[in-house]
């Protein structure tokens, strides 16, 4: 079985886009739900996605495992996987990793463009690499 997966996407999400994904045969999408948001702001983004899942259950659902990609293909829907471009949602609390995973996050970059608590970003003049927390 072959799958079509969009490995990273950020858009002005709407029913029109969800229908276009289905027309294009997209089985799964890694959706950016945090660039530089803190934990609370990220939870608000997840809340907005939960409303979309309720409004468009015939088009999308929250993906959590590889089996969800298969289920999406079999049911003619798109599995939405949450990801962060930077670890800002975990703030300075490593325990929040488990919490955001429970809420559905499946991808988290150690850094985006700037220095994070975990690693150096590509825009930094000095590359210090992974931090002690990272």
Regions found by a protein language model. Name each.
Residues 1-128:
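N-terminal hydrophobic targeting/anchoring segments and the immediately downstream early-domain regions
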Residues 130-134:
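Loop-centered beta-sheet repeat module
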């Amino acid at each position: 079985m072959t799958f079509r997966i969009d490995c990273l996407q950020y858009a002005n999400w709407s029913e029109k886009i969800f229908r276009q994904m289905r027309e294009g045969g997209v089985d799964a999408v890694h959706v950016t739900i945090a660039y530089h948001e803190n934990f609370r702001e990220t939870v608000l983004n997840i809340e907005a996605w939960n409303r979309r899942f309720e409004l468009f259950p015939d088009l999308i659902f929250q993906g959590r495992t590889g089996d969800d990609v298969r289920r999406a293909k079999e049911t003619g829907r798109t599995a939405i996987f949450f990801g962060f471009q930077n670890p800002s949602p975990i703030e300075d609390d490593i325990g929040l990793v488990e919490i955001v995973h429970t809420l559905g996050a499946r991808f988290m970059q150690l850094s985006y463009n700037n220095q994070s608590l975990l690693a150096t970003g590509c825009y930094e003049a000095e590359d210090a690499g992974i931090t002690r927390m990272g």
